[in-house]
Design a protein with these regions (language model features):
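Pyridoxal 5′-phosphate
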Residues: 1-387
Length: 387
């Protein structure tokens, strides 16, 4: 199988990640739940992971690095824990349902929600302008919630400029880094990010079931869940100290061990090298498919010759063929794994007018090869010729 669905999850990871997960499953106990060697080993590994990820993202305090099952849980913790009725939040048309649905729930509670539309004039590329976000700020605005990159088009958002706008107006800035963590440099301090939400199983090369959020000092998040913590057990309420405040229940120790190893392996390779390789594969793919009769490529790729930032995601359609049909042919006849449909990004499909057709998404990893990209392009050519 040629696996080109890395925006959903990476399958090929450094071998050391698999080894770390297995070793933790064999030898680590439950962190914070005893004084046995096994429990202490788990606690040490999780602490090491907090330290590593805090440094990786430019944070100041490892206690503010909270582990979750994925970015969806991290975003729910942030969105449901920060806002009260009567407050106002700004988000964008690019967002995944992991941002939109929690915000819609908050809207039902009386939180105002404004969605910044794409600013394209003429050809639709799916671009968000920071100035359009600033224009929607009101006296009751509390936060801006924004993705770092679209999971549908790969377009990268200028979060540094948005962070400056948020800080200028004394707003909280919450960033969904699901597609960029482990691919693009992220610095919480330099980008004025108050809450960074990330998943472990994509660019960070960790296992599924891992993720987290870094909670800045300005963000006072109410606990999303409560329960066992291993400390202060006579308290009726969840302890207020981070990370315990937001980490009720047993953590995914083996997964976190794998995530730690994934990040350490990324640092050995270097983010610049990872981005350059993925960018090269994406650009080669676009060059090969852009002249296919009936092909439509979605996103802002005009910057590619100048090496502008863009995640290695290419979403396409072939004339009026249903995206699910194209993806099914790619898998069953060519052994190429892609993702079809709406990709949990309904507002972007409304923007592009593809609500019914969906799109076929190709997403590349550092571990993909030029030969695989060539085979995928050739398969699209053959499918287009038969329509």
């Amino acid at each position: 199988m040629i696996y080109l669905d890395n925006a959903a999850t990476t399958i090929k990871k450094p071998d050391a990640v698999y080894d770390a997960v297995l070793d933790a499953m064999k030898h680590c106990g439950n962190s914070g739940r005893g004084a046995s060697d096994a429990s202490l080993d788990a606690s040490r590994k999780i602490y090491e992971a907090r330290m590593c990820l805090t440094e990786f993202f430019g944070g100041d305090d490892a206690a503010r690095l909270v582990f979750t099952a994925n970015a969806t849980e991290a975003l729910n913790i942030a969105i449901h824990g920060l806002f009260e009725p009567g407050e106002h939040v700004i988000t964008t048309q690019l967002e995944h349902n992991s941002v939109l649905r929690p915000l819609y729930m908050q809207r039902e509670r009386g939180v105002g929600v404004d969605i910044v539309p794409c600013s394209d004039v003429g050809i639709k590329r799916g671009i968000i302008s920071p100035s359009d976000i600033e224009a929607l700020i009101r006296p009751d605005t509390k936060a801006i919630v924004c993705t770092h990159a679209s999971n549908l088009t790969g377009n990268v958002v200028d979060i540094k400029s948005i962070g400056q706008i948020a800080r200028k107006h004394n707003l909280l800035f919450i960033v969904d880094a699901s597609q960029t963590a482990g691919v693009l440099p992220i610095n919480i301090r330099e980008m004025n990010i108050d809450v960074l939400c990330f998943t472990g199983h994509k660019g960070l090369m960790g296992p599924q079931g891992t993720g987290g959020l870094y909670v800045g000092e300005r963000a006072d998040i109410k606990p999303f869940k409560s329960g066992g913590t291993g400390v202060l057990s006579f308290l009726e309420n969840q302890p207020m100290e981070l990370p315990t405040r937001l980490e009720a229940g047993t953590l995914n120790g083996p997964g976190i061990a794998g995530l730690l190893t994934g990040v350490m392996e990324l640092e050995k390779i270097g983010l610049d090298n990872i981005y350059a390789k993925e960018h090269e594969l994406m650009q080669a793919f676009i060059e090969k498919i852009k002249t296919i009769p009936g092909i439509r490529i979605y996103g802002d790729f005009d910057m590619l010759p100048d090496k502008g930032l863009h995640c290695a995601i290419v979403s396409v359609n072939i004339a009026d063929m249903d995206s699910a049909e194209v993806s099914d042919i790619l898998m069953n006849e060519y052994g190429i794994a892609t993702r079809s449909g709406i990709h949990c990004a309904p507002l972007m499909h409304k923007f592009f007018g593809t609500q019914n057709q969906g799109m076929v998404r190709f997403s590349f990893s550092y571990y993909n090869t030029v030969d695989e990209i060539n085979e995928a392009a050739e398969a699209l050519m053959q499918i287009a010729a038969l329509r």
